[in-house]
C-alpha cells in the first residue's frame, strides 16, 4: 500500500509514476474525496470546539446556580449535526482507503518503461558450456518436450492427475517423485547452508489478513482457492505466510536482516490462463516451490534484491541449467513490486526461455499493509521495513528443465551431479 501522505502531497507525481505501468490511472476521485474530507473535517473541528466551549460554560453556570437552558438548546443542535458529519467523514475515509488499497506500487526509477513482456530487458545470461554470456548448448538431436520424456520413462502421469483431481494436476511416480524431492532438498540445503537463510515450514492455509498484507487481496481473489465453510485460503506462494511472520511486529535493529526460505505446495486457480500451457508441468493448479524472503532496512533493499536474485541464479548454475535474467518493464511487474527480475531457464523442447523465478523488491508496500516495522535504536521511532521475495526456485519447472536439458538421444535422462547424493547415487534415469 502506498503512503497516503505521499499521495496527498505528491498526487501528480504518484499519478505519473503509476501511469508508467501502462494503465489509465486517474486520481481525480482521490482528489475530490480528499477535498470533501477537508471541508467536512474543518466543520467537525469547529463543532467539536463549540461543543467543548458550551460544555465548559454550562458547567460554570451550573456552579453559579444560573440558568443554562439556552446553552442546552445550542448543545442539542450541535450534537446531532456533529454525529452526522462524523458518520459522513468515516464513510469518506472508507472510500479513500478503498482507492488506496487498489493502487499498485510505483516503479523504481531504474525500471525500464514498457507495456508488456516484449519490453523487458535482458541483463545477463549463463550456460554451463559458455559461462557468463553463454548461449545454451546444442543437444545434437531433436529435443523432446518434458511431458513426452516423463511419460515415456513412466515418471510423470498426467492422466492419473486428471482422474484424481482434474486438469492441470499431475502424479509424480517413482524416480519422478524422488527427483522432485531431490531438487527441493538441494535448493533448501544451498540456501540454508551457503546463503544464510533460515528454513521455515509454514501452514499452506492462510487467512484474509495475511493475503491482504502481501497484496493478493482484495485485487486477486479470483486466482485463489478458498475453503468452503471457513475463512481460509490455500497459499498461492510461501511468500504469503513467511512474509507475514513479521506482520504487526516492531523488530529490533539487531534482528535485521532476516533471510527465510520455505518449501511448500502452492495452489493457484490460474484464472485467465485458459488455453495456455495446457500440457505438461509449466502451469499447474498445485505445484511445489522453494521461496526466498528477506526483511531488510530500507537503505539496503536494492542491494538485497541483487543478492536474492543471485541466490536464485546459483540454484540453476549448480544444476548446470542455461538461463537468462531480465528486468521487468514497468508494465509487466506484479501488483506489489517496485522492481522485479525474472530468471528464465532454457527449455530445448520448447526452444525458448521460460520463467522459473521472479525476484522482487516491494520496498515498504507490503510492510505498510502488514504494519511491519523496526527500531534502529531501543527507544527510536518505528520505521517500516522493506520486504523482498523470490522463487528459489519453482521445483516443478526445475524438473522440467532437468528433463529437457539432460535428455539423451536414446530417451534416457542424465541426473545432474549435485542431485545424485539425493538420488541414492543414481546417475541416469531410464
Curated annotation (Swiss-Prot):
The keyword Cytoplasm applies. Its main location: cytoplasm. One of its GO terms (biological process) is seryl-tRNA aminoacylation. It comes from the Bacteria. It catalyses: tRNA(Ser) + L-serine + ATP = L-seryl-tRNA(Ser) + AMP + diphosphate + H(+); tRNA(Sec) + L-serine + ATP = L-seryl-tRNA(Sec) + AMP + diphosphate + H(+). It holds the Pfam family Seryl_tRNA_N. L-serine binds at residues 237-239, 291, 391. The keyword Ligase applies. Pathway: Aminoacyl-tRNA biosynthesis; selenocysteinyl-tRNA(Sec) biosynthesis; L-seryl-tRNA(Sec) from L-serine and tRNA(Sec): step 1/1. InterPro entries: aa-tRNA-synt_IIb, aa-tRNA-synth_II, aa-tRNA-synth_II/BPL/LPL, Ser-tRNA-ligase_type_1, Ser-tRNA-synth_1_N, SerRS_1_N_sf, SerRS_core, tRNA-bd_arm. It is an enzyme of class 6 (ligase). Keywords: Aminoacyl-tRNA synthetase, ATP-binding, Cytoplasm, Ligase, Nucleotide-binding, Protein biosynthesis. ATP binds at residues 268-270, 355-358. Gene3D superfamilies: Bira Bifunctional Protein, Domain 2 (3.30.930.10), Serine-tRNA synthetase, tRNA binding domain (1.10.287.40). PANTHER family: SERINE--TRNA LIGASE (PTHR43697:SF1), SERYL-TRNA SYNTHETASE (PTHR43697). Homodimer. The tRNA molecule binds across the dimer. Belongs to the class-II aminoacyl-tRNA synthetase family. Type-1 seryl-tRNA synthetase subfamily. HAMAP family: Ser_tRNA_synth_type1. NCBIfam families: serS (TIGR00414). Catalyzes the attachment of serine to tRNA(Ser). Is also able to aminoacylate tRNA(Sec) with serine, to form the misacylated tRNA L-seryl-tRNA(Sec), which will be further converted into selenocysteinyl-tRNA(Sec). This is Serine--tRNA ligase. The lineage of its organism: Bacteria, Pseudomonadati, Pseudomonadota, Alphaproteobacteria, Magnetococcales.
Amino acid at each position: 500500500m502506498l503512503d497516503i501522505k505521499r499521495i496527498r502531497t505528491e498526487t501528480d507525481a504518484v499519478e505519473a509514476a503509476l501511469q508508467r505501468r501502462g494503465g489509465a490511472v486517474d486520481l481525480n476521485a482521490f482528489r475530490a474525496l480528499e477535498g470533501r474530507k477537508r471541508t467536512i473535517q474543518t466543520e467537525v473541528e469547529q463543532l467539536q470546539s463549540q461543543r467543548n466551549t458550551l460544555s465548559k460554560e454550562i458547567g460554570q453556570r451550573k456552579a453559579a446556580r444560573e440558568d443554562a437552558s439556552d446553552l442546552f438548546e445550542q448543545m442539542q443542535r450541535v450534537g446531532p449535526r456533529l454525529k452526522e458529519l462524523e458518520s459522513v467523514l468515516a464513510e469518506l475515509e472508507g472510500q479513500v482507503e478503498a482507492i488506496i488499497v487498489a493502487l499498485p506500487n510505483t516503479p523504481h526509477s531504474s525500471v525500464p518503461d514498457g507495456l508488456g513482456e516484449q519490453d523487458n530487458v535482458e541483463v545477463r545470461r549463463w550456460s554451463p558450456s559458455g559461462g557468463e554470456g553463454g548461449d545454451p548448448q546444442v543437444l545434437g538431436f531433436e529435443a523432446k518436450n518434458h511431458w513426452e520424456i516423463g511419460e515415456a520413462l513412466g515418471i510423470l502421469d498426467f492422466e492419473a492427475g486428471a482422474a484424481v483431481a482434474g486438469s492441470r494436476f499431475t502424479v509424480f511416480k517413482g524416480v519422478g517423485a524422488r527427483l522432485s524431492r531431490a531438487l527441493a532438498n538441494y535448493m533448501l540445503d544451498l540456501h540454508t547452508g551457503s546463503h544464510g537463510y533460515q528454513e521455515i515450514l509454514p501452514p499452506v492455509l492462510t487467512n484474509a489478513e495475511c493475503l491482504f498484507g502481501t497484496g493478493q487481496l482484495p485485487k486477486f481473489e479470483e486466482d485463489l482457492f478458498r475453503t468452503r465453510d471457513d475463512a481460509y485460503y490455500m497459499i498461492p506462494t510461501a511468500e504469503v505466510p513467511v512474509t507475514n511472520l513479521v506482520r504487526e511486529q516492531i523488530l529490533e535493529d539487531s534482528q535485521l536482516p532476516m533471510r527465510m526460505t520455505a518449501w511448500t505446495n502452492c495452489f493457484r486457480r490460474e484464472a485467465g490462463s485458459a488455453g495456455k500451457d495446457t500440457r505438461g508441468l509449466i502451469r499447474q493448479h498445485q505445484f511445489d516451490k522453494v521461496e526466498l524472503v528477506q526483511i531488510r532496512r530500507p537503505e539496503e533493499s536494492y542491494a538485497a534484491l541483487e543478492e536474492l536474485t543471485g541466490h536464485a541464479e546459483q540454484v540453476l548454475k549448480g544444476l548446470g541449467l542455461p538461463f537468462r535474467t531480465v528486468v521487468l518493464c514497468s508494465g509487466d511487474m506484479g501488483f506489489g513490486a517496485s522492481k522485479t527480475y525474472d530468471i528464465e531457464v532454457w527449455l530445448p523442447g520448447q526452444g525458448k526461455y521460460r520463467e522459473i523465478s521472479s525476484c522482487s523488491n516491494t520496498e515498504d508496500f507490503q510492510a505498510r499493509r502488514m504494519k511491519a516495522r523496526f527500531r534502529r535504536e531501543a527507544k527510536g521511532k518505528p520505521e517500516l521495513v522493506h520486504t523482498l521475495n523470490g522463487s528459489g526456485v519453482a521445483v516443478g519447472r526445475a524438473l522440467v528443465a532437468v528433463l529437457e536439458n539432460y535428455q539423451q538421444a536414446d530417451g534416457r535422462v542424465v541426473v545432474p551431479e549435485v542431485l545424485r547424493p539425493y538420488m541414492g547415487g543414481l546417475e541416469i534415469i531410464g
